[in-house]
Amino acid sequence: MTLKNRFFFFLLATCLISMKCAAQALPGGRYSAKDKLKLEKQQDSLKLFAFNIVNGEEPGQRFRADSVFIRMLVRSLKIPNSFYFPFDSLQTISKLYAPDSSFRIFTWQIKKDVYVFLQRGAIQMRTADGSLKLIPLHDFSMFTKRPYDSVRNANNWIGAIYYRIIQKNYNGKNIYTLLGFDDFTINSNKKWMEVLTFDEQGQPVFGGPYFSFKNDSAKISNKPVDRFYIEYKKEASTTFNYDSSLNMIVYDHLISETEEPKRQETFVPDGDYEGFTWLNGQWLHVPKVFGNTMKLDGQFPQEQKILNDAGGVDESLLKQPPEKKK
């Protein structure tokens, strides 16, 4: 399977999950039948441009599609109560509702060339009167040497395509943890764990003192960590998701397959899992979640396939937590 196809199925799986969450989370807000027809018509137009953002053969095609898509999306979202319209036909765009339905976040990426991927994003807030409150997110990743040790806003966001939102509450404050994917370089990918809060003016704040590495050595640096990521070999499959039964974010422990620990593009799963558990308003790092898990034949465990034998997306697999190794 090509990298483009793998990315497409990653987004498709994200869309299926977000559709299920939206159906469960959204309250009784409604758009009129007339506005529904408008939104459906807009969605039909948006589909082509959303597809070409990812699949356009030339950079110019992709960037033109991206520019038109953004303008059309904003026009669509200005339709009253558009917040409740799922845009579920836009399969190359991630759309996630917060568990409390207070906002949703759109994210996607555009390929400049084989070396550079840019992320796009916007947060749509739910409003009482159905009007549009939209906060564009500007990807600042390529201008940042140390993306993990700074609190940021919408204008200097560390871009990612989000596939999960976990909501916690501490001292009366809602804290949202975003899990996201970044097609980082030609040789490696990243998966991000980003904490999102909102300030008194309702503006997004990304990052903060929400990570604790007390009594372990897994920390990215000796300085405070305001967000967390793993970087790994482009062809590797990695787990990085929330397990509600454990109240933990669980992810693969990585090692260099070439014994070069400073080259993260050589990192692959070794069969062990690490994680973070929520405790007293912070994500506390857990160095080892399950027991030793290396397969007897020395092969690295592979992430469960999302596609079934017929080539369709197996939704039941999307709902399963990482398998606990014996």
Predicted segments with their positions:
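Bacterial Sec-dependent N-terminal signal peptides
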Residues: 1-38
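Start-of-domain marker
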Residues: 25-105
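Beta-propeller blade signature
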Residues: 119-129, 192-200, 268-280
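Short N-terminal edge-element motif at the start of the domain
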Residues: 122-169
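Short aromatic loop motif centered on NTY/YTY
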Residues: 149-157, 161-169, 205-277, 301-302
